[in-house]
Amino acid sequence: MVLNSNYDNYKNKITNSMKPLINSVNPAFSNQENPNSVILTTFNDFTNWARLSSLWPLLYGTSCCFIEFASLIGSRFDFDRYGLVPRSSPRQADLIITAGTVTMKMAPSLVRLYEQMPEPKYVIAMGACTITGGMFSTDSYSTVRGVDKLIPVDIYLPGCPPKPEAIIDAIIKLRKKIAQETYKDKSKFQQGNRYLTLNHKFHFVSNINTGQYNKQLDTKISNSQFNSTLDTFIPIKKNENLTFLLKNEDNKENIENKSKD
């Protein structure tokens, strides 16, 4: 067996490359005696790292912007590398991306979905129609001019529609925002008051589903009113019957006269 003279040098290079590299300026460990599996960190940094690495968005698309968001699921952009897992239930999501136009009828459903999400939760307003109402903001009576009138927004993503690269950039900015949060900022997770503009006057009414569906008629209408309506209704029916009978008798007489002739 013949060995090359460079074999020993190659073996030494491999053993040297397998040694852990430690930065002399800002070491990752307290000292070199600690094992490589132990990393010193803080509670805030650990929780922030866990949350920003596992953002689960809620699929909420109402317009053409959702097509651009759906393209992120493919292999070309592959947003799974950021830890994003699409969810269909708001109770399992901590991020909602409002992609598309928000109408007046969709506004209560959107607020309900947001309130069902666990804390902490984040919102990305995607597209011009979501941020300002878009082309429907001038003469439309059924479009909400900005989703921030309903729920608090963390990241605004303009465009009509935004490109998938812009969505990834918005997610990266949101990850940086989460990384800078502290545990003392928990109070900001509380839902604040939503201020509505004069253009959108929402009238909050009580719930109509009272469960009392088998009410008697006399509870709504008094007996006197019910009898008065019957008194006015019965003579009309009698008169109609009399006129119908008279018409039939006249027709019979005409038929008999024609037969005699």
From Swiss-Prot:
Enzymatic reactions: a plastoquinone + NADH + (n+1) H(+)(in) = a plastoquinol + NAD(+) + n H(+)(out); a plastoquinone + NADPH + (n+1) H(+)(in) = a plastoquinol + NADP(+) + n H(+)(out)
PROSITE patterns, sorted: COMPLEX1_20K
Binding sites annotated in the UniProt record for [4Fe-4S] cluster: 64-65, 129, 160
One of the GO biological process terms: electron transport coupled proton transport
Calcium in keyword set: no
Main location: plastid
Topology in membrane: Peripheral membrane protein
EC number: 7.1.1.-
Manner of cofactor binding, per the entry note: Binds 1 [4Fe-4S] cluster.
Enzyme class: translocase
Keywords recorded for this protein, A-Z: 4Fe-4S, Chloroplast, Iron, Iron-sulfur, Membrane, Metal-binding, NAD, NADP, Plastid, Plastoquinone, Quinone, Thylakoid, Translocase, Transport
Cofactor dependency: [4Fe-4S] cluster
One GO CC term on file: respiratory chain complex I
One Pfam family it belongs to: Oxidored_q6
Subcellular location: Plastid, Chloroplast thylakoid membrane
One GO molecular-function entry: 4 iron, 4 sulfur cluster binding
Transmembrane domains' residue ranges: none
Recorded family membership: Belongs to the complex I 20 kDa subunit family.
Biological function: NDH shuttles electrons from NAD(P)H:plastoquinone, via FMN and iron-sulfur (Fe-S) centers, to quinones in the photosynthetic chain and possibly in a chloroplast respiratory chain. The immediate electron acceptor for the enzyme in this species is believed to be plastoquinone. Couples the redox reaction to proton translocation, and thus conserves the redox energy in a proton gradient.
NCBIfam families reported in the protein's UniProt record: nuoB_fam (TIGR01957), PRK06411.1 (NF005012)
Subunit comment: NDH is composed of at least 16 different subunits, 5 of which are encoded in the nucleus.
Name of the protein this chain belongs to: NAD(P)H-quinone oxidoreductase subunit K, chloroplastic
Organism of this sequence: Physcomitrium patens (Spreading-leaved earth moss)
